[in-house]
Structures are given as C-alpha cells and as structure tokens.
Regions:
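Phosphate-moiety recognition in structured ligand-binding domains
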Residues: 1-146
C-alpha cells in the first residue's frame, strides 16, 4: 500500500522554495488513464505550491530533461513513480529482460539524483498503476492541504 506516503510528501513539499520546480518521473506504461492521473497530480502540485511541474516518462526523459535534472542548479524536486506488473519480454542473447533493464534504469536515475544531493522520492504504485495513482491523488490532496 501507500502507507507513509503522505508524511513523506509533506516533508518533501516543505523544502520547496520560489524558483524551484517539481519533476514527475513516471517509470510506468504510458496510457491514457495513467497520463490523465499524472496530469491531475501535476495540476494539484503546481496549484498548491505555485511552482512549475514537469512530467516525463522513463526512460525517454533521460535523453532530454534528465540531463537538466542532474546538471545545473539544485532547484528540482523529483517524484519518481514505479510499479510492478509490467509486461515483460526477454532480451535475446541476454540473461535479463526488458523489465529488469527498466528497473535498473529507474534505480540508477534515483541513485544519481540522490548522490547529487537532489531532493527525490520514489512511490511504488504496486501491480495496478492506475489504481495506485487514484489512491495517490487522494493522499496528495491531503498532503497539500496541510
């Protein structure tokens, strides 16, 4: 479940100052339901905190905004979403799958952000990302209201 997430969000959001931005880093299968729920998160965060909020899907964002996240100023606050239950395919000639590769990439991205002293948190949405995001939006609304 998402127990403990509200407290973590409140702690993370208390660090945000004018000039900062929030980056939603979604390591999820991109579909209409997931995108719509993430856009809702984006609107809630931006509206409540008065800072820009970006949304990127991994691993694609690593080749564009991912460079900005790691270089330059430390104005970014990063909220990484992961989930279990991804469709998986073996990579021919290798002893790992695409899900393994995806997981390693998201782990590495979070580790680098942390190593650079960036403010970052991960939320694992469980086996059903859309349902997890529905629960998360409710938790987010509560965290932003306090």
């Amino acid at each position: 479940g998402l127990a403990g997430v509200a407290e973590g969000l409140r702690h993370l959001f208390k660090t945000i100052r004018q000039g900062d931005y929030v980056a939603i880093l979604a390591w999820l299968d991109e579909n209409e339901a997931v995108r719509s729920l993430l856009e809702s998160c984006r609107a809630h965060i931006g509206g409540a905190l008065g800072v820009p909020v970006t949304l990127g899907f991994g691993p694609r964002y690593l080749h564009s905004t991912g460079q900005l996240h790691k270089g330059g100023s430390s104005a970014g606050v990063f909220l990484q979403f992961t989930a279990g239950g991804r469709a998986d395919v073996a990579i021919p000639g290798h002893d790992y799958s695409f899900a393994d590769l995806h997981s390693a990439q998201s782990d590495a991205d979070l580790a680098v952000l942390s190593d650079l002293g960036r403010r970052a948190a991960r939320v694992n949405l469980g086996e059903d990302p859309a349902q997890g995001l529905i629960e998360f939006v409710s938790i987010l609304e509560g965290a932003l209201a306090t």
